[in-house]
């Protein structure tokens, strides 16, 4: 018996579901691949993996092509998971995972995982106009030089400005607070108020895609001039974090110029990808920071090679 089956046996599950976890059940998913405008993507290469826990004989891996309607089928026996990845020149890859490892969400009927023959749509974003952006990844940690005071931060160089770093432009002001003791509280406030009409807005990543963020910044979006994130750990309770999550990012505008009426003339645009970390000795880090060095250019489709 598989090591996790005693846990399943303690739950109220049907005999068919239990047998599906013991001996596997047939999975079938019909995929349709479309581009970001909804057009079918034919002749794309779909790579399919079936993984079974404790049943290596059911593991499988193969490749196929999407047909003229952008469709392909994944079908095999499993007790755990289906993973697919789709690639084609001129497009960003996309992926999907179907997990059968949840007794509350899954069911088996006649030896088949339900819904058998489920239809799913995958979106392959087109490569439009990738450009070279200044790029800093999550390995670039910045120790917090001082708490309780506003610190200038250069988003292009991803560093504090003088006297704490090599940054040259106060693209955003950062305020860190830290309270240690029986309870622990850490906050970071990001303010763009030193640049008129600068700010940021928050979006969800397209986690399925090789391009998880937007192609371009929206110059007409509502840009918040400040945002605040916190981490609280009260004695005897689990920590509570209100931060930029792994599946989120900020689109920002800074180094703005306005006319005599206060109307926007130009600015620089970029992206801060979560997760945002500002707790602990490591200091400040993000998944990555992108900065378009070309004034007025809203293009954020980064050329990563």
Per-segment meaning from a language model:
Residues 54, 77-107:
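A short, solvent-exposed loop/turn motif at the edges and junctions
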Residues 107-109, 114-118, 123-305:
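Surface-exposed, beta-sheet-biased, low-hydrophobicity segments with strongly acidic/polar composition
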Residues 11-39:
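Beta-strand-rich domain onsets/edges
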Residues 44-51, 99:
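Hydrophobic beta-strand segments
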Residues 29, 42-46, 82, 186:
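Short beta-strand/loop motifs in extracellular/secreted proteins, especially
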Residues 1-7:
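Bacterial N-terminal signal peptides
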Residues 40-41, 52-76:
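Short, acidic Ser/Thr/Gly-rich low-complexity loop/linker segments typical of extracellular
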Residues 27-38, 46, 70-72, 122, ...:
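A short, amphipathic beta-strand motif
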């Amino acid at each position: 018996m598989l090591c996790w089956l005693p846990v399943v046996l303690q739950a109220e599950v049907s005999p068919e579901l239990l047998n599906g976890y013991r001996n596997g059940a047939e999975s079938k998913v019909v995929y349709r691949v479309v581009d970001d405008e909804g057009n079918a993507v034919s002749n794309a290469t779909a790579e399919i993996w079936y993984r079974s826990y404790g049943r290596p004989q059911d593991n499988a891996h193969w490749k196929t092509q999407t047909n003229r309607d952008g469709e392909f089928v994944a079908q095999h026996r499993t007790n755990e998971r289906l993973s697919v990845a789709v690639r084609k020149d001129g497009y960003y890859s996309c992926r999907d995972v179907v997990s059968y490892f949840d007794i509350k969400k899954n069911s088996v009927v006649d030896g088949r995982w339900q819904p058998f023959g489920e239809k799913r749509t995958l979106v392959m974003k087109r490569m439009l106009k990738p450009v070279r952006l200044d790029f800093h990844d999550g390995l670039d940690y910045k120790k917090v030089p001082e708490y309780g005071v506003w610190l200038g931060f250069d988003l292009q160089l991803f560093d504090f400005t003088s006297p704490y770093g090599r940054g040259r432009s106060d693209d955003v002001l950062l305020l860190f607070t830290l309270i240690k003791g029986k309870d622990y509280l850490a906050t970071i406030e990001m303010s763009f108020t030193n640049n008129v009409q600068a700010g940021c807005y928050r979006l969800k990543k397209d986690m399925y895609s090789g391009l998880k963020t937007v192609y371009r910044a929206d110059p007409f979006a509502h840009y918040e001039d400040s945002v605040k994130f916190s981490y609280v750990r009260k004695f005897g309770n689990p920590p509570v974090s209100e931060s930029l999550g792994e599946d989120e990012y900020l689109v920002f505008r800074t180094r703005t110029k306005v006319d005599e009426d206060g109307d926007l003339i130009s600015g620089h645009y970029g992206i801060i990808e979560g997760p945002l970390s500002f707790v602990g000795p490591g200091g400040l880090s993000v998944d990555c920071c992108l900065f378009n060095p070309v004034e007025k250019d809203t293009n954020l489709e980064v050329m990563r090679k």
